[in-house]
């Protein structure tokens, strides 16, 4: 089997459903034979490793550990789902304190054991703030660390495809930006259905509002259906992000990236992005006045959560971030 690279990929939280799916997806896509599975729950991560061995992936060098030094040492790529999952009735924001404490430790491990890592993807919620926490603590450059945000856009795309009875791939330009949560900004003004602008499809304002709400609640709806938070879709998209960073096909769905410009300062937020072997690059979104206002509101919500983790002492005040990360 031919692999994209031989460099070490570490999967954090590998004993869980997202982590185990990431391991299998990375091997099925042929990213690298050298995969280290890390979790604090030994029976879980051991069991996942055994499952991967039983798959019989050609040339694979799968290891597992509960020791962070072993897991992070010499890692060139890392994906972390190592936080508490969302349960029914919870918002992503309900996970803020505990998961940001985990993210701070995660960033410290990167700085201590693998400062030369090339790219890191954070996918545990609230992903915008856990990723920001990890970035501050890790010392990495902003383009080296991203958070998963693509699911909101694929949910919007899926909802529109179902509405018009077309294949999902026939829906283009369906994106969400800002926060990965209840305050996400849905951008639909550039959507096309089979090449035809959405504005020409006769969709009522009421139906579009319903589609937007279903998109925002897509994760919680899945929890109600399956009794657990999503795991296959985040696993797949996170691995595709890392594949792009390894030099595979660029990842062009929105990703959470560090933004500090004239309009939005010192936050991680979903933007129009491209991930490739040189890192994550973003441009400012184009949209209607209503869409841009929704993005401003989402940014304000992200600032509020950022200020909460500052108040909790998980990260320092913004003015002091450079003391922990000279790249910010």
What kind of region is each of these model predictions?
Residues 28-34, 139-142:
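Conserved S-adenosyl-L-methionine
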Residues 137-143, 153-328:
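C-terminal substrate-binding/catalytic lobe of Rossmann-fold NAD(P)-dependent dehydrogenases
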Residues 19-20:
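N-terminal Rossmann-fold NAD(P) dinucleotide-binding loop
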Residues 1-7:
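A short, basic/flexible loop-to-alpha-helix module at the beginning of a structural domain
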Residues 15:
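Conserved glycine-rich cofactor-binding loop
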